[in-house]
């Protein structure tokens, strides 16, 4: 299995956190519990602090440059692409018998 680069991991976490913030704040749904969100957000925060140059090269740098692990409320919750992903994930999770 190939190991992710730091930039790839930052990009992945940014996108996951944005999608799950859209689910929580806009759709009133969540497939992550608070512990999972906190774990992912703290991991991203640590990567950002330890790797500022890689962070500046990330896909969502402008949206995450003021990010704090405590909340995703100030992220771009109205982004149409990530909203579509969030809606799809909620529906998929429901179809698989999960609760949201």
Segment roles from a protein language model:
Residues 1-100:
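Phosphate/adenylate-binding "loop-and-lid" substructures adjacent to NTP/NAD/dNTP-binding pockets
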């Amino acid at each position: 299995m190939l190991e992710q680069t730091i930039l790839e991991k930052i990009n992945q976490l940014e996108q996951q956190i944005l999608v799950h913030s859209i689910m929580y704040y806009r759709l009133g749904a969540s497939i992550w519990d608070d512990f999972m969100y906190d774990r992912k957000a703290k991991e991203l925060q640590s990567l950002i602090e330890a790797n500022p140059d890689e962070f500046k090269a990330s896909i969502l740098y402008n949206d995450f440059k003021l990010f704090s692990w405590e909340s995703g409320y100030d992220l771009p919750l109205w982004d149409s692409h990530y909203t579509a992903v969030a809606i799809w994930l909620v529906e998929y999770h429901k179809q698989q018998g999960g609760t949201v």
